[in-house]
């Protein structure tokens, strides 16, 4: 694998980790509207571990690196978030295994692996008012742009925009999974905290792309 390809993966993960830590209160406040309010705390603790271990993580290839991330966050994130995020990174790692380069198709495969892992681990799908309602349509849009021959910058921008659009749209949905589902119809009117967190993270990744 090229050094540049691995560097891109490292950048994405490092940006994700920094945003999760910096936005702890914001994500927690979002989650507290109809959830248990621990999303910000859980993500921050998990990705603090990633940042603390950063220099010692194995970097043989993208798959190995992502597997190390999965293990790091799973060891620190409690509740339901740990298994979900850990599984997402493990599935992304599996999708990247054997890849010599990380091109657009590989990114889509990694995102599909991550969302499939979240579906299986969380017993959730589109329409349940979770981060899947933002990440899956975003991945679909990315794949469509790639097929149309859009530039890398156009693809990244469109991906982030679609994730944000769909995250905001979860405010019209009733939660069917997680603590928010206990609120029933009262969950309508506010967006899913996980979906918004993913949108914020991806917007930061795209805005600061090196």
Predicted segments — roles?
Residues 1-210:
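N-terminal loops that bind phosphate or other acidic moieties
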């Amino acid at each position: 694998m090229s050094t540049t390809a691995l560097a891109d993966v490292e950048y994405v993960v490092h940006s994700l980790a920094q945003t999760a830590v910096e936005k702890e209160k914001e994500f927690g406040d979002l989650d507290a509207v109809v959830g248990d309010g621990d999303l910000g705390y859980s993500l921050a603790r998990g990705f603090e571990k990633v940042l603390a271990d950063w220099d010692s993580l194995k970097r043989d290839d993208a798959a190995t690196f992502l597997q190390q991330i999965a293990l790091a966050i799973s060891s620190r994130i409690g509740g339901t978030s740990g298994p979900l995020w850990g599984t997402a990174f493990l599935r992304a790692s599996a999708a990247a295994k054997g890849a010599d380069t990380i091109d657009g198709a590989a990114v889509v495969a990694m995102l599909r692996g991550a969302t499939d892992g979240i579906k299986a681990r969380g017993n959730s799908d589109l329409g349940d008012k979770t981060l899947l309602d933002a990440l899956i349509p975003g991945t679909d849009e990315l794949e469509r742009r790639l097929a149309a021959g859009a530039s890398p910058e156009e693809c990244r921008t469109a991906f982030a925009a679609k994730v944000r659009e769909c995250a905001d749209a979860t405010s019209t949905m009733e939660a069917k999974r997680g603590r928010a589902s206990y609120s029933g119809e009262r969950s309508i009117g506010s967006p899913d905290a996980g979906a918004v967190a993913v949108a914020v993270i991806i917007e930061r990744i795209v805005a600061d792309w090196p």
